Amino acid sequence: KVLAWVKTHEVPTPRIVDVGVGSGAIAVTLAAELPTAVVLGVDISAEALEIAKQNADTLGVRDRVKLARGDLLSPVKSEHSVDIVVSNPPYLDDALMASLPRDVRDFEPRGALTGGPDGLDVVRRLITDSVRVLRPGGLLAMEIAGGEQGATVAALLAQNGRFSEVTLHPDLSRPGRVVTAQILPTTE
């Protein structure tokens, strides 16, 4: 969805932030597919950032994938300077977290998976923080659990009042697994 958005909106040099970059899969793929893009990958985990760095080196995009340790969008200091914020944030609710197979629960850091009782603690913060960094017309794209959570996230974006074109997209397994929204122009 992000690649199509860049093409239809003719963004010549996309400035992208991948929040919760983890291994760098999204950041590295976007840099590889969009040769003029500059991607900032943010994570609170130093270990994750090291893995992302290795993956960017391996795929030859390290010069356009910058990495920063921080909480959500805190490393982005300039307001309205980003074209796209992408994230696969922690979105599992407590019940779903408890039902995961033990090998998943025990392998992945809990903070990378669970977003609190309803799974949306990080998503709520990311919606609010994105308003500060996205340029007018910029795109927010997040992976979510789908199902009822998709409708809830769409409602959160609408309630924020700064987003338009809120759309839920399916993945191969379920509807509503990715949500995209464009930020409205500022009214200042």
Region roles according to the model:
Residues 117-183:
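Conserved Class I SAM-dependent methyltransferase catalytic core
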Residues 91-122:
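Mobile active-site "lid"/loop adjacent to the S-adenosyl-L-methionine
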